[in-house]
């Protein structure tokens, strides 16, 4: 079996629809199905499943037409930089430990965060700087918590692939990355997903599909057995919210994932408008619903004259990269 630590650390982007995402977007915006242009998807992740549940049309634009997000948002950039810093810190600590060296210091943690933040395309603006200042207390709290207790970290950014047969001829894959897995004194493991922002209530963690998928991956893909606990680590509050997934619960998750995959593969990708799904949708200007939250980035794009009902709007959509 391949060592999961040796798998290249690359975020999956999903299947490419073809050489011209704009043409695909125009086809979908005009009421056509993306499945007219590409085979039914056989690759899924927690993010794709969550996006489809929020709005099937948004899923089609992002993951089938492969349209990029309009712009980097400070909240997402902050979270990405934090994840990169924590990953670098625990990896370096683990590697130093095998060499009998002292663990990295607080200055190293900040250096990794600054490097990740500088690598983003976020414009220099007051809102971005406000987010940047939030890093200091977060890094202080993470450093203090990680220094107070010995953690035996198995690995970081662990890639998994769950293979799910839908029928004798159809196999789909649910893949992703687990932020961190620690070994526990009991001989089992704890999986950890870092979160920035406000901590959730215990019942929200209990119903988390993301934690269920990751726990299933620990057992069925990574060969680590059922984790003793699955944890959301809210780093800005230094709070951990943990849940337990039984084997029976994980078996149910497998069945549920297969059902979700079938639903997506048979979908017409009709939009499901709501303030949550439309207010910050990068593709609202291409959607016929126009149920947009006032003042949202989507409204600004529509104000610039981009509308799915106008064929010229599609051609004026920003230049798109070639799909991976």
Question: Where does each model-flagged region fall?
Answer:
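A non-catalytic, helix-rich entry segment at domain boundaries
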Residues: 84-164, 323
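Mg2+/Mn2+-dependent nuclease catalytic core
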Residues: 158-255
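C-terminal, charged and often intrinsically disordered regions of DNA end-processing helicases
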Residues: 1-77, 297, 303-324
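Hydrophobic (often cysteine-bearing) scaffold residues that line and stabilize catalytic clefts
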Residues: 74, 78, 82, 131, ...
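Short, polar/flexible loop-turn hinges at active-site or ligand-entry regions and domain interfaces
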Residues: 67-75, 93-100, 124-125, 201, ...
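Short cysteine/histidine-rich zinc-coordinating motifs and their immediately flanking basic loops
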Residues: 290-300
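Short cysteine clusters
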Residues: 55, 278-281, 287
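Polybasic (Lys/Arg-rich)
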Residues: 249-282
């Amino acid at each position: 079996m391949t060592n999961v630590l040796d798998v290249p650390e690359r975020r999956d982007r999903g299947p490419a629809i073809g050489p011209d995402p704009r043409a695909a977007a125009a086809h979908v915006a005009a009421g056509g199905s993306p499945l007219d242009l590409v085979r039914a998807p056989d690759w899924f992740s927690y993010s794709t499943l969550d996006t489809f549940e929020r709005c099937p049309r948004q899923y089609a634009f992002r993951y089938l037409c492969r349209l990029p997000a309009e712009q980097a948002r400070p909240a997402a950039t902050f979270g990405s930089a934090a994840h990169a810093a924590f990953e670098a810190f625990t990896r370096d600590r683990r590697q130093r430990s095998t060499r009998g060296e002292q663990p990295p210091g607080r200055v190293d943690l900040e250096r990794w965060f600054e490097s990740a933040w500088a690598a983003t395309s976020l414009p220099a603006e007051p809102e971005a700087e406000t987010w940047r200042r939030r890093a200091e207390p977060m890094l202080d709290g993470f450093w203090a918590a990680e220094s107070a207790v010995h953690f035996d970290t198995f690995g970081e950014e662990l890639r998994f692939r769950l293979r799910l047969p839908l029928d004798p001829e159809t196999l789909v894959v649910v893949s992703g990355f687990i932020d961190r897995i620690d070994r526990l004194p009991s001989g089992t493991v704890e999986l950890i997903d870092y979160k920035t922002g406000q901590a959730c209530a215990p019942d929200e963690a209990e119903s988390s599909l993301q934690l269920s998928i990751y726990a299933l991956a620990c057992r069925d893909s990574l060969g680590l057995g059922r984790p003793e606990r699955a944890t959301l680590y809210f780093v800005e509050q230094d709070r951990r919210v943990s849940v337990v997934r039984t084997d029976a619960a994980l078996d149910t998750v497998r069945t549920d994932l297969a059902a979700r995959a079938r639903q997506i593969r048979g979908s017409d990708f009709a939009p499901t408008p709501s303030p949550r799904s439309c207010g910050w949708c990068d593709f609202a200007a291409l959607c016929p619903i126009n149920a947009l939250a006032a003042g949202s980035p989507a409204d600004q794009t529509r104000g610039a004259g981009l509308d799915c009902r106008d064929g010229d709007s599609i051609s004026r959509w920003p230049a798109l990269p070639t799909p991976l």
